[in-house]
Amino acid sequence: RQRQMCIRDRLIMAITSVALFVHIVVICAASTREVVANKEFVWYNGKRPITYSLPGSVSPVVTVALDMFKGDMQQVTGVLPQKTLFGTAVINIIQLDKNKSILRDLRKDGIPVDSIVARKDAFFIKIRENQLLVVGSDGRGTAYGILELSRLAGVSPWVWWGDVTPMRKERLTLPADYSTFQSPSVEYRGIFLNDEDWSLQPWSWKNFEPSDIKGRIGARTYKEIFKLLMRLRANAIWPGMHGITTPFYFVPGAKEAADSCGILIGTSHCEPMMRNNVGEWKVNERGDYNYITNREGVQSYWIERLKEAGPYENFYTMGMRGIHDSGMEGVKTLQEKTDALQQVIDDQRKLLSKYVDKDVEKIPQAFVPYKEVLQIMENGLQLPEDITLIWCDDNYGYMTRLSDEEQQKRSGGAGVYYHLSYWGRPHDYMWLCTTQPGLIYSEMKQAYDCNARRLWVVNVHDLKPAAYDLELFLDMAWNINSVSPSTLVEHQKSWLCREFGKEAGEKLLPAMLEFYRLCGIRKPEFMGWNQVELDKKKYTKGWSPVKNTDFSLTEFGGELDRYLESYEAIKEILSEVEPMIPQERKDAFFAQIKYPVFGAAAMSTKILEAQRARCISPGSCDTTLWTRESQLMAACAKSIKAYQEIRDLTDYYNNELADGKWKYSMCHNPRDLYVFYPPKVPVWLTDKEIEKYASLKRTKSLPLAEAVKDSCIVSNACDYTSASKGVVTIQSLGHSMNAVSVPKGKSITFEFDCLWDGEAILRTAVIPTQPNDKGDIRFSVSIDGEKPRICSIKEPFRSEGWKQNVLRGQAVRETGHQLTKGKHTLSITALDDHVLIDQWMIDFKPDRMFYVFPVQPTY
């Protein structure tokens, strides 16, 4: 009987191989007249359903991707694609690692099989004799190839999460010579669901899949997350780990859902061996989380999870810290910490070898030298070569360390943990996602160039608010050359056109560029000019109160008004574009464009109009600003109305958007921080008074050309007169939106006319990057060949200087100079790597109080 089964299996394999071979022969023999005549390949003609073939075996992730593709095509064409026989299908799909018997025949047909199979997650698509061939190196690669067809049909990756309903099409075509071969630049690419308490988590357990278990992000939710990651060509996740959230491995079906979607599970820097300590370690049951005094208990805890997780694809975090984001327990001196951590890692390797794979070097492992752990690593910790070093940013988008030349030689390579949202000092940003695209590009390209190519993970509190920034991050992880310093704007334009149509997308582009500029000047969450995690003895909760901003009502023709006017201008653009948006994309437009723009504008109005009201009210310290009562009332009314507008926008998001699909997903006041409170105005108005006064027009700011005549010369760095070879302008970065990367030893030079004599201050604004080694970030300035003045922007982590830099998005350094009327030359030279110059300003009134350099942005 066994012999009969063996013969049967061999016969099936032989038939399959022959069928595949015949299939390719049929492809080669098919008529090409239609393709040649029309110079295009028609894969849907509006009459018959799209057909596909899936010969041989495939991984579960391919089945999931195929179901997604079929659903996409049903929305695009109105007809569900049909599976058919070899040789007759429009689309033919092959997963190479499951069908090795066909490799020789594919080679004969000119398919670059060897190049495909040599790469993980790779796919190749080509039109062959009036049929479309999709070849994947493995399960994920095949799945990405299938979903690439959805992209080619105009389906957005945000079709479900962003409600970007596909547009119906009567015809789908590709160029007759179309082909693409894609493979990832970074091996593992994914997200860390963190600080999910006010968005993803309540939406999941209260709305999307209601549960009696408070805080549970269910398996259905995870499945939708994983499907989005598939569409974004990502393959890794660190699940939510807050105490209020049910641990991932406690959610029935969650790990199976990940496996079916080809998603690798990892954990953050304080969750070794796949354990969520915050939610899983119970001190009253297990004792102290202390490897010195409770080594057996800790190991038993780890072994439990290794037995459970071992059969699945994981990336194991090595080492040990405290239960949450704190140092290791039971050790005091640096040497004690080093010895203890060495023992932990040695023991963890033995456990992995015993319970996961005897060849421990084949198991993906990560070590995160974060906070105190970096000091321990540099104290002589012996870290096996195959373990991947995961470097972190400073929580605000600026990388703090990357592998040196020796570390870049490690077989385990390196990776990056990056933030698009954050809970902590100097201030949280967990409401909107406003990290400038140019900053993401600059920092991640630098990381890639330093060989951080094994794992990229980005911290997001939710998926929807981070849509564009998240996709840019993952686009770079998939193809590091998908964007460049000079194509960042084009990348965003393409994204907007894909989401909202060509005409609307092109009109939205200048508005969204301005949005990122204004948020780069100050994130909405930072508008209170206050901080968190301060001394609790001095401040209630450790939070300082909201105070007046550095925006001036009077300097440079009213920079406070100019900032508000800029927001009003982009709101007007959105109001003009909104009627152009197809009805089926209205929900997407609201969530991805209108809510963040109108919300950020309202936050600025709330804060700045309240500041105006306090300044012009009777009793103000600045009596020159006392004005008529109506102006005071108007400022109060505008501030209060803006506060209510944020609440109204959020109410619509949660209760009406997509018929309530996203209820509980948007919170306008995460952690209930002071910046989200009602405004501090001298007079709280009634609804009738608000209606009466809010419509009064504010005084307009002076045009910048007129405002800067007041004893200053100002320029964006990108407007240089000359530059050394290697100088590069990076779009969508800085207050200028075109910061300049100046390589070490290189310079940019400016010629300018001075209308005044005397002493002046040169203010040089630089992107507050961090040295990626133990070095510095220095530049020098020199006017007319004088002795260069050396400036450093290096600041200790969490120092007040560092805090102000990340809140402002610039590090400003001042130097004194003696100038005369006439022509002059300014030279700025980089003395270290990663110097990014944003703006400069020569000011003959060094004591003036202002915030923004008074110069037009350059788009």
Language-model regions, residue ranges each:
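Structured mid-domain segments that build the active-site/substrate or prosthetic-cofactor binding neighborhood
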Residues: M230, N235-W238, T245-F248, G253, ...
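Ordered core of a single globular domain
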Residues: Y567, L574-R647
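Short, small-residue-biased leader/transition segments that mark boundaries at the very start
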Residues: R1-I7, T627-T699
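Bacterial Sec-dependent N-terminal signal peptides
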Residues: R1, R8-A37
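Gly/Pro-rich turn-and-neighbor structural signature
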Residues: L172, Y249, A257-D259, N284-S411, ...
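Feature activates predominantly on carbohydrate-active enzymes
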Residues: P112-T293, G310, A366-Y370, E378-Y398, ...
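Extracytoplasmic
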Residues: L673, K680-Y859
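Contiguous, structured surface segment used for ligand recognition
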Residues: A29-S183
